[in-house]
Amino acid sequence: MEFTFTLKYQLSTQAGGDDDMLDRLAVEGCDDAIVGLGQPGRLALAFIREACSANEAVASALAAVRRAVPGATLIEATPDLVGLTDMAEVVGMSRQGMRKLVSVHSISFPSPVHEGRASIWHLAEVLAWFQGKGGYSVSQGMLEVARVAMQVNIRKELDRISPESVALATAG
């Protein structure tokens, strides 16, 4: 099965030149990705990877990038965090239709990760809700890769905080 996802990185000063890095990425198995170097100090890889599972696809890509660009720090795996417009696009409806749906189903719709001027949700939770509702076309591959991207991002954030902070957050 093919899985589509993007990995975004902050480059270290040891990343080397762009041509050298592109060669290392290809040698390490990232030849199934479109590479973006438009922002100085950043690297984005948009993969379409063949694998038995989304977990295998993303894990193999993460390992390949780690080998090719050892000092790079993962910023984000996508698709994960989405706003109303992104959700609407994924399920094939208008932004206004999505806003109304979220409002009408405010009790059962997944809670946002961030609520403010622009709210953000985990795509995996939203797709699972749509799948449970029925009547909406949800790609199983998209749901699977969104779940894996969410897990990668949560793990990355947990690794950033101290054990004491984790204990405090989970106490109770």
Language-model segments: residues:
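Polyanion-binding surface elements
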Residues: 78-101
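Major-groove DNA-recognition helix of helix-turn-helix-type DNA-binding domains
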Residues: 93-119
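A short, structured beta-strand/loop element
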Residues: 17-42
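Short glycine-/aliphatic-rich beta-strand segments at the starts of folded cytosolic domains
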Residues: 1-13, 82
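Short beta-strand-to-loop capping motifs
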Residues: 9-13, 45-52
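A short, Lys/Arg-enriched interface patch at domain edges and termini
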Residues: 125-172
